[in-house]
């Protein structure tokens, strides 16, 4: 038995683990690089699907390109970003991205990924949903671990169109928000300033509430 939407939203937000929004965080070697990537996304009007290539390796199984999101709170995103910096990943996540309502993405085909040993689970499921598989391998024999479960990842096949009113933009600081508002064409695309979310403010807000 389900619950009403308002109850679902209240429960989800009170848990401070997931969110009613799914977040597409942007990777980049610097804040400047990630901000410029964000601008290109906004100017194109799409999140482009890919095979999510990392270290010259496609992380998406099968032949279906996807757009990746995370079902996480801002606190959890901060931990993910901090962890990537600790691992010294050149193309790590930055505090820039796009958020879209989870229910709309779900309606359009987005689903949580399946964390499991890829070679085992792919023998049990249809090839048409290989795109949902993310390899999980905690190999105590070799002490070589592959574990992305902290990302709480969702994926959706194909490009995702950014429709006015149905997305929010994440920028790192107030300074980047002011800069974004004055970029050519942004006032028309992002009609409400409240739809530009300042990452550091959201994290600070949660610290004050705790």
List the predicted regions and their residue ranges.
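NAD-dependent ADP-ribosyltransferases
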Residues: 1-210
């Amino acid at each position: 038995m389900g619950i009403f939407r308002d109850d679902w939203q209240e429960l989800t937000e009170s848990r401070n683990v997931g969110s009613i929004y799914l977040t597409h965080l942007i990777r980049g070697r610097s804040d400047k690089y990630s901000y410029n990537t964000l601008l290109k996304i906004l100017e194109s009007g799409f999140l482009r699907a890919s095979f999510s290539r990392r270290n010259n390796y496609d992380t998406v199984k099968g032949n279906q390109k996807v757009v990746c999101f995370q079902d996480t709170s801002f606190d959890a995103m901060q931990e993910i970003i901090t962890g990537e910096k600790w691992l010294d990943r050149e193309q790590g996540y930055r505090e820039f991205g796009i958020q879209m309502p989870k229910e709309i993405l779900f309606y359009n085909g987005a689903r949580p990924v399946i964390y499991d040993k890829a070679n085992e689970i792919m023998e049990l499921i249809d090839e048409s949903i290989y795109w949902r598989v993310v390899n999980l391998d905690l190999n105590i024999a070799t002490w070589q671990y592959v574990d992305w479960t902290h990302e709480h990842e969702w994926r959706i096949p194909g490009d995702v169109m950014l429709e006015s009113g149905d997305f929010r933009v994440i920028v790192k600081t107030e300074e980047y928000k002011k800069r974004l508002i004055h970029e050519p064409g942004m006032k028309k695309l992002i009609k409400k300033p409240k739809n530009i979310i300042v990452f550091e403010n959201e994290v600070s807000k949660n610290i004050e509430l705790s």
